[in-house]
């Protein structure tokens, strides 16, 4: 059974909870606001499925990219509402056009970041932009599997750890599944964000639709942001692909595609196709 002795050994993907046939695993929040699995040993039948779907315990061999593209969304408005050139929206709209399902992270009515799905292009808007908080996956791995078995085209967007957890949970390859992840520096605490909202939300004036966006100011550099990040993910020895190739490609974009790099709403534009 899953037994967390060191918090670094859990990425919080929730795969173990969703795969358990006896529903004896639940996620509990620690003092820092992160969720970790807890097993009800009275109900556990020692099937070890939770261990088999854990992306930390059972790691895959790193995979090489099939192709790498430098690309962007031609719509500047969408680029400015998005991250990394707005490519997610292009992919998601194509999936919706093919009667597919799109999963992503969004804010709920309580300003919590959760994973959800949409079957409409209007729903894609909620998934745009960076959300520097660990999302609550819920039962979206189960939902994804059900849609895949129905033959629906599915796009699932999440952190590298969440994508690894999803693929472990599915335990087979699906030709009708597209996964989208991103360069991740570690997920900040939902607990810290909750505290911030309690302290500051009353001071924030929203105009029109209620929206919340994140930005890292220079004073809050990546090393400082690590202070509220989960102890995992970026420290896992193996990745689902060769990250060095991705970073090298990204660094070459500025010189090899200067016009694209200077346009509004462009940060990282590397689209990597891999199996």
PLM regions: where:
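Short, charged amphipathic alpha-helical surface segments
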Residues: 42-43
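General structural feature for long, well-ordered alpha-helical segments within catalytic domains
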Residues: 9-12, 16, 46, 50, ...
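Generic recognition of cysteine residues
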Residues: 11-13, 24, 47-50, 184, ...
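Iron-sulfur-associated redox domains of electron-transfer enzymes in respiratory
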Residues: 55, 61-275
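Ferredoxin-type iron-sulfur electron-transfer modules and their immediate structural context
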Residues: 1-19, 23-26, 244, 258, ...
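Iron-sulfur cluster-binding cysteine motifs and their immediate structural context
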Residues: 2-4, 15-32, 36-38, 48-65
């Amino acid at each position: 059974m899953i037994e967390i002795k060191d918090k670094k050994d859990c990425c919080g993907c929730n795969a173990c909870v969703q795969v358990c046939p006896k529903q004896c695993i639940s996620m509990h929040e620690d003092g820092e606001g992160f969720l970790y699995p807890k097993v009800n040993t009275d109900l556990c039948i020692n099937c070890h499925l939770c261990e088999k779907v854990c992306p930390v315990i059972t790691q895959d061999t790193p995979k090489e990219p099939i192709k790498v593209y430098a690309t962007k969304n031609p719509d500047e408005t969408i680029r400015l509402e998005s991250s990394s050139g707005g490519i997610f929206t292009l992919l998601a709209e194509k999936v919706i056009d093919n009667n597919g399902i799109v999963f992503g992270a969004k804010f709920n009515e309580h300003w919590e970041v959760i994973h959800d799905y949409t079957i409409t292009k209007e729903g894609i808007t909620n998934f745009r932009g960076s959300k520097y908080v660990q999302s609550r996956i819920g039962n979206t791995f189960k939902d994804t599997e059900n849609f895949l078995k129905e033959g629906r085209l599915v796009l699932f967007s999440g952190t590298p750890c969440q994508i690894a957890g999803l693929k472990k949970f599915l335990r087979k390859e699906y030709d009708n599944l597209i996964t989208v992840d991103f360069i991740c520096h570690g997920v900040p605490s939902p607990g810290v964000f909750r505290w911030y909202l309690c302290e500051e939300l009353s001071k924030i004036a929203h105009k029109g639709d209620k929206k919340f966006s994140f930005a890292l100011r220079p004073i809050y550099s990546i090393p400082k942001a690590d202070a509220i990040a989960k102890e995992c993910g970026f420290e896992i020895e193996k990745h689902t692909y060769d990250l060095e190739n991705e970073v090298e490609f990204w660094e070459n974009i500025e010189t090899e595609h200067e016009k694209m790099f200077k346009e509004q709403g462009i940060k990282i534009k590397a689209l990597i196709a891999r199996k």
